[in-house]
Structure formats: structure tokens, C-alpha cells
Amino acid sequence: MIAHLSIAQNKKTFYDFTATTIDGKPYPLSQLKGKKVLVVNTASKCGNTPQYADLEDLYKTYGGDKFIIIGFPENNFMNQEPGTNSEIKEFCTKNYGVTFPMMSKISVKGKDMDPIYQWLTTKAENGVMDAPVTWNFQKFMIDENGNLVGTVPPKEKPKCDKIVNWITGKQ
């Protein structure tokens, strides 16, 4: 029993990480405690890129004290995000009016995978599931306590029932 408690106490949560904003500033995820967080890996030259519009709509509808979306640009799939952070920011703002937090471009798979994505995709780290990123716009659902509670495939629209019901507590 005591060994089990010490393992549980040492388990990392989403809040234990710090990301870097698209503008290069530290973004401690601990500031999101108490919110549901939808984490999405993004790309500007993908068939799923129009999901930015749905993500922004979801953010405008539900974002605030209880819910937030965080975008992580990446170039892991067929070079579909070749731009610099400033080019990505301009693209997202100009074409989709993105106001939800966007982070600096990272890697979501392979040897240079960002530690946040190592946690998101590895059951040994998140304690819930192995969930390798299969393509751009895969969605990870984080509860108010910083725990991974589910994923949504890349092709599934951000405003799907699974995500909306989770945000609104109808799940």
C-alpha cells in the first residue's frame, strides 16, 4: 500500500510541464489548473488545416475559466508545417483568426519528440494509454486535474459530440 501511494504521488501530470509560446515565452502549463485542455498538433499545409476554424469556434464558444485549447505546430508528417514560428503565427491569425494559445513548433514523434508529447503518448508516463500521434490535428483531452482522459483522431472534427460533450460535462 505504501509503495503504491509513493508511485501515485510521483506520477507527472500535464501541469508539470512548461511549453514555449509561438512568441518564444515560457508557458507553464500549471497555470491551466482547474481547466479542461484540448491539446492539438497542427500544420498549415494539411488537408486537416481547415480544422483551425472549428478549433477557433470551439474556443470562442467554450473557452474561458473552464476550458482552453493549445495548439502545437509540428512538421512531422510530410513537411506540412515548414514555416517559422512567426510565419505560422501570421498564417493562423490571417487565415483563421486564431486567438487560442499557439506554442512554438515542436516534434511530436521520433527521437526529438517534445517531453509534453512523450507524456501525452506514452502510458508509462501518463498512466492512462499509449496514444501515438498518427497525423496532424490529433486531439488530446486533459481534465481539470491535469490527467489525460482521451484522444480524438486527426480526421475527427473539433466540434464532434465526443469533444463538445466532454467540455460541457455531458459525457
Predicted regions mapped to residue ranges:
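Amphipathic alpha-helical repeat scaffolds
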Residues: 21, 41-45
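Thiol-based oxidoreductase modules, predominantly thioredoxin-like and allied folds used
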Residues: 66-83, 98-110
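Thiol-/selenol-based redox modules, centered on thioredoxin-like
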Residues: 115-118, 123-171
